[in-house]
């Protein structure tokens, strides 16, 4: 007989959630504070969000972050999908363990180590650090997350759908484009959104690989906070939290859609 949650478990859960989310809630609330003093409540106001629109440096950093996020997410989606296809479809090829380890290494490797390694690489090949080096760094970081999402979908994929298409004379490439790709498209889109949100709030890798004219939004926020917390920082952080949360919700919905398609496809085939 299953026991219900004890008071200790409920208390521990409540304290854990409070420890994680109360500071975020305070930041969001104080982003609407009318007072310039961040510790003194002066009433509700959208003043600091309006002032963000006139902060040229912050807007430039936001644009740089958006461009890097879109490019790195697109590159990570393509490379991660190809890596997932190789790991699932090619079986136990020679070097599979090494290949998989290299793909998933950023999951377990501290970002400081990854950032330092990339910095040494860029210095060794004499590449000017800036927009493109950050893009490469973020692609390296997010590729593994895309590979995990797509690989999980491919592992549950019904290969008989592809076999039926090829039995009807459909060539392999057309089979992939018309049968496989539409069914794994939600997983690919979910991986793209996840990679984009991870790129948006990365600070460590960007700090190692940034250069002149490539100040991302997290770096800009960090440099501003070192001089003291301002109400504008609360506002821009609230916007970042909202964007990342929305991205994670979209990724979760797409992942569920991918699973639902995978479950319904065999039924349609049998019919």
Residue spans for each PLM region:
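C-terminal transmembrane helix and the adjacent membrane-cytosol boundary/short C-terminal tail
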Residues: 2-12, 85-87, 91-95, 151-162, ...
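Interhelical loop and adjacent transmembrane-helix boundary motif
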Residues: 2-5, 49-58, 200-250, 254-257, ...
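Transmembrane alpha-helices
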Residues: 11-12, 17-24, 139, 147-151, ...
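Loop-to-helix entry region at the N-terminal start of transmembrane alpha-helices
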Residues: 17, 60-67, 117-145, 185-187, ...
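Short membrane-interfacial helix/loop motifs at transmembrane-helix boundaries
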Residues: 22-56, 207-212
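A structural signal for multi-pass alpha-helical bundles of membrane permease subunits
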Residues: 22-36, 64, 115-126, 193-198, ...
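Transmembrane alpha-helix signature in integral membrane proteins
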Residues: 32, 56-87
